[in-house]
Every structure is written in structure tokens, then in C-alpha cells.
């Protein structure tokens, strides 16, 4: 039997929810408060939109930082290969890049949105832009199977539609809330869904940053703005307690550090574990042990023994980083390499292996509150 379903939110999740609900034979209305659909998609992946990852689906769970079991049915119900097939079948070919990252062949996130819009049109989904939902509509229902004489009859809320910001009521047999979180207010992610979920009886946890860059207090970071490092390792500590370590890519910004490895760190570090300011240690040469790196530096110094120090480490570091490392080492940049002491060389070695910086480092609906597996709130 066909149902009238309202989808709140026109991002990637909302558009896909609307498509599949319509494909099941339902009449769908998609409500989006912005002037266009997929506003956040436009800026995803630096404007290229990293759609998914082409790894084995089991690997995806390893990158879910908490409660990965909650996503088993979702991942296997519409896995990464299905995502790729969906977009290619709607006129958007994809390519797989380093790290199994999947992008549109065109490198344009707008093509992702166009493919989703074609899919919605194909299923005759009604799309209403500039339409903001203020709250859900409910009616109380009582479990009729309960003993008529019982005093603790079970009462639930049945959602019957939505109220728009202008006061208009829209009736529906079911409502799908796909508003996103509180991550990027200028794109429409203003946390509306949290209030709706809370009103529906769900537990909403405290919101804290996740998948975000880190601010770094050291001034030298600003001079490295735009520098991207690959094959680098980081370790993050709160006092003596190690909270996170990883290997991969990072990017220096005007305020600190970002990049895949840093974003993953921000998602992994629980605020409850942070008892004092964080310290991050960057290993610029993780493939080499300290002893092996020392030998490498000695070889470079031997080849450049008559050169000034500032001209001797260009094979070891990106050009933009050399002035920073020289300053932090405390070695006179004009000093001849053959005059550098073992103590000075050891200081340089430690900067390569443990470049230290201080940094400032997730929320949503609690998936452990017993209300999610198999529950749909009569939506």
C-alpha cells in the first residue's frame, strides 16, 4: 500500500532516502530549507566530493570510531559497490584514486548533485525548496493489546506530519528526518534534527567537534600554511596518556593542522579523555628508526661537509619546512656542516622524529539508548 512520506532535509542522505522510498511505490515530498539541494555536497572533498571508498566493506567498519555494529545493516543494505553502481547508472561515471577513494571522473561535486536530482525526477519526487520545518506533528496512541484493566498501558507518539516555519501543517503517513548534524550551519546543518529526535523520545548526547582540524599554539605553524605532508606519523597525548596515533597525510594551515589523519584523530579522541592540553608529536620519517635516520643524516652531512647547515638538509625535508626546522634546532644556519656537534645533530634528529606542538582538539543521537535497532517511531 502506497504511503505519503515527507523527507526533511535535501542533502545526500535525504535525497537518497527520498529516492528509495519512492522506488518502493510511495508518494514522496522532499523539504529543503535552502535555495538548492545538496548545499554541503558542493564543498565536500575540496569541491570534488569523495563519494565512498572502494575497499572491502568490512574495512569500512574499522574506520567507524564508535559503535560500528550500529551501521552493519546500513552498510550491507547499501554498500559501497551499490553506491558506485547507483551513480554510474544515473549518468555519473566514477574513478578510484589512491587509498581507494572514489570520485566523479569530472572531479566536480556538482555532478554528484545532478545525478541525485535526475534520480529524484525519475521517481517523481516532489521537491520543495525554501521550506523549513519547525517541528514534527504527533498523536498519542495506546497499545490496544494491553489488558484493559492494566494501569500501565503503553502509550507512544505516532508522527502524523510536520509543521513548517510559516505555520503550515503538512500531513504524512511517515516522516524521514535527514537534516544532518550541527557541523556546518552556513550549509543548513544547524542541528534541527537533534531537537526533532529529542521530541520523539530519543536521547541526544552533548555536541562536541568531530572530523575537524586542530588549532596549534606554536607560531611556526603559520609559516607552513599550505604544506602537505605524506607518509607522516602522529601521536597525540594528554599528559602522559597516549590518546591517538596514526600514519598518513596531514596539511598545515594558517591556524594549525588538518588533512585526513588529523580529521580522523578529532573523531577518535573522546572529550572525556582530555584532562589537560593536548600535545601532538609529528614523526617526519616514520619509515626510519632513530638509529637509521641518524645514519642518513650523517651521510647527508658527509656529502655536504663544506656547505652551510642551511644548505645541507634539502634532501631530507620539503623546502618550506627547512627554515622552521633550522630555527627550532638552534643551530646557526650559516654554520659549516663539519662544525656541527653530536649534541646539535641529536637535537635535529629529535625534531625529525618528535616534532612537538600543542593543540586543541562527537555528538549526536545516542545509538545505545535501546530505541534504534528495529524502531521507526511510527515514522
Question: How does the language model describe each region?
Answer:
Residues 22-46:
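Glycine-rich FAD pyrophosphate-binding loop
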Amino acid at each position: 500500500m502506497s504511503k505519503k512520506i515527507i523527507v526533511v532535509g535535501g542533502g545526500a542522505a535525504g535525497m537518497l532516502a527520498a529516492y528509495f522510498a519512492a522506488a518502493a511505490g510511495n508518494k514522496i515530498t522532499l523539504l529543503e530549507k535552502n535555495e538548492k539541494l545538496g548545499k554541503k555536497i558542493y564543498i565536500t572533498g575540496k569541491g570534488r566530493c569523495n563519494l565512498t571508498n572502494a575497499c572491502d566493506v568490512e574495512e569500512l567498519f574499522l574506520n567507524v570510531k564508535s559503535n560500528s555494529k550500529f551501521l552493519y545493516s546500513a552498510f550491507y543494505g547499501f554498500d559501497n559497490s551499490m553506491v558506485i553502481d547507483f551513480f554510474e547508472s544515473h549518468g555519473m561515471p566514477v574513478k578510484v584514486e589512491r587509498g581507494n577513494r572514489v570520485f566523479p571522473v569530472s572531479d566536480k561535486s556538482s555532478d554528484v548533485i545532478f545525478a541525485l536530482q535526475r534520480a529524484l525526477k525519475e521517481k517523481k519526487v516532489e521537491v520543495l525548496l525554501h521550506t523549513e520545518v519547525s517541528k514534527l506533528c504527533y498523536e498519542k496512541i495506546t497499545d490496544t493489546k494491553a489488558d484493559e484493566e492494566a494501569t500501565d498501558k503503553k502509550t507512544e507518539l505516532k508522527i502524523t506530519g510536520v509543521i513548517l516555519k510559516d505555520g503550515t501543517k503538512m500531513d504524512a503517513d511517515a516522516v524521514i528526518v535527514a537534516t544532518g548534524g550541527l557541523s556546518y550551519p552556513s550549509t543548513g546543518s544547524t542541528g534541527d534534527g537533534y531537537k526533532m529526535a529529542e521530541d520523539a523520545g530519543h536521547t541526544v548526547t552533548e555536541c562536541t567537534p568531530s572530523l575537524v582540524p586542530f588549532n596549534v599554539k606554536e607560531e611556526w605553524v603559520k609559516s607552513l600554511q599550505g604544506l602537505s605532508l605524506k607518509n607522516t606519523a602522529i601521536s597525540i597525548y594528554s599528559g602522559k596518556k597516549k590518546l591517538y596515533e596514526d600514519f598518513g597525510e596531514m596539511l598545515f594551515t594558517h591556524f594549525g593542522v588538518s588533512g585526513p589523519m588529523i580529521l580522523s584523530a578529532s573523531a577518535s579522541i573522546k572529550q572525556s579523555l582530555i584532562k589537560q592540553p593536548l600535545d601532538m608529536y609529528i614523526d617526519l620519517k616514520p619509515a626510519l628508526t632513530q638509529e637509521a635516520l641518524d645514519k642518513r643524516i650523517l651521510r647527508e652531512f658527509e656529502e655536504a661537509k663544506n656547505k652551510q647547515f642551511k644548505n645541507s638538509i634539502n634532501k631530507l625535508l620539503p623546502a618550506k619546512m627547512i627554515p622552521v626546522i633550522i630555527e627550532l634546532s638552534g643551530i646557526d644556519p650559516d654554520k659549516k656542516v663539519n662544525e656541527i656537534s653530536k649534541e646539535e645533530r641529536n637535537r635535529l634528529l629529535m625534531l625529525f622524529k618528535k616534532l612537538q606542538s600543542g593543540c586543541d582538539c562527537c555528538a549526536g543521537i545516542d545509538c545505545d539508548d535501546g530505541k534504534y535497532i528495529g524502531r521507526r517511531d511510527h515514522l
